[in-house]
């Protein structure tokens, strides 16, 4: 749950009326409460503090107080802080993202998270505002707690000098694409910071959830967006070229970088600066053609780039790498944004066929997490694509209404 690199200009919605903060809290059925500090932890500014809020009170529902005891910080950045907390009333562990809130504006992350509900997207439980003695206003987003990140899982294998087993690569990347297919089609959201640190992993079930929507935005065709977005190693080339009218295909590039990193055990494009990032990409994909440059940013077509030949994909990965893995990576990491496959197309790729086999299980014999409970993201999918996405055994199990099948 890390922040994007460096301070970024936030694209904010039009300022709401002055009472908007209180109204936002009221519409959420949540009243503002002052942050109550309880110095039980060490010198840490968070550990041991208790945050109380009132929920309910709508539709005849009784109001009740919920208190959270902050346990440890799990992420910090320019956005604020994320900490693990325990609900004192229920004992449930949650993650709370606490961000300084400008009273003049709505919080985009909150608006987007309220609109999303999917097994592979982090769930917003509720939110509330808190204030400090200096009258600073903070928004607290209370989310489900998932203990691991893909970054830490990969680091575990790297430290042991091992490659991540292919079954886990398939399972994690498939679920990442399922989450992207949902956010790209249903709420129409572009995440804009897909990276291993923002992919949560449950170590018991191996369910994956996309998190940190602090950089996310609904992209409107013809409306400019900032290009300084997305962490460097995962930044699509059109962003490096300064494009402002990009599409959700920037997330597809980032996911392709994550796939390659899981297969290699290290980042595919480890640039040390924005320019060096482009050099790293050119070393693998070769120099972009004039047409490819035009697709990324028409203003750069007259620039002279050193002519470098593409490095064959099969030479980038080790000899035993399945050709399906290499084929998928090559379909994701294309210079032309429109040539990258969609997230739903990626889910249907043959690299993931093992997950669709009737008796497929986790290495420990336990069942996979839900993989086929698609919802509205299939609304515009062709019958042929749906046929590739939903295995026969799932279709038989759930009858004809397979678009809503659970696994």
Curated annotation (Swiss-Prot):
SUPFAM superfamilies on file: Protein kinase-like (PK-like) (SSF56112)
Domain Protein kinase: 68-352
EC number per UniProt: 2.7.11.1
GO molecular-function terms, A-Z: ATP binding; protein serine kinase activity; protein serine/threonine kinase activity
Active site: 193
Tissues where the protein occurs: Highly expressed in the entire young panicles, spikelets, awns, vascular bundles of palea and lemma, stigma and rachilla. Expressed in root tips, root hairs, lamina joint in the collar region, vascular bundles of coleoptiles.
GO cellular component terms, A-Z: cytoplasm; nucleus; protein kinase complex
Induction / repression: Induced by cold and salt stresses. Down-regulated by drought stress.
SMART domains: S_TKc
GO-annotated biological processes: brassinosteroid mediated signaling pathway; cell differentiation; negative regulation of brassinosteroid mediated signaling pathway
Knocked-out gene: effects: Increased length of spikelet awns and weight of seeds. Increased sensitivity to brassinolide. Enhanced tolerance to drought, salt, cold and heat stresses.
Composition bias type Pro residues, residue spans: 1-19
The reaction(s) this protein catalyses: L-seryl-[protein] + ATP = O-phospho-L-seryl-[protein] + ADP + H(+); L-threonyl-[protein] + ATP = O-phospho-L-threonyl-[protein] + ADP + H(+)
InterPro entries attached to this UniProt entry: GSK-3, Kinase-like_dom_sf, Prot_kinase_dom, Protein_kinase_ATP_BS, Ser/Thr_kinase_AS, STKc_GSK3
Entry keyword set: ATP-binding, Brassinosteroid signaling pathway, Kinase, Nucleotide-binding, Serine/threonine-protein kinase, Stress response, Transferase
Pfam families tied to this protein: Pkinase
CDD domains: STKc_GSK3
Disordered, as annotated region: 1-21
Residues that, per the record, bind ATP: 74-82, 97
Similarity comment text for this entry: Belongs to the protein kinase superfamily. CMGC Ser/Thr protein kinase family. GSK-3 subfamily.
Role noted for this protein: Probable serine-threonine kinase that may act as a negative regulator of brassinosteroid (BR) signaling during flower development. May have physiological roles in stress signal-transduction pathways. Phosphorylates LIC in response to BR perception.
Subunit structure, as described in the record: Interacts with LIC.
PANTHER family listed in its UniProt record: GLYCOGEN SYNTHASE KINASE-3 ALPHA, SHAGGY-RELATED PROTEIN KINASE IOTA-RELATED
Protein name: Shaggy-related protein kinase GSK1
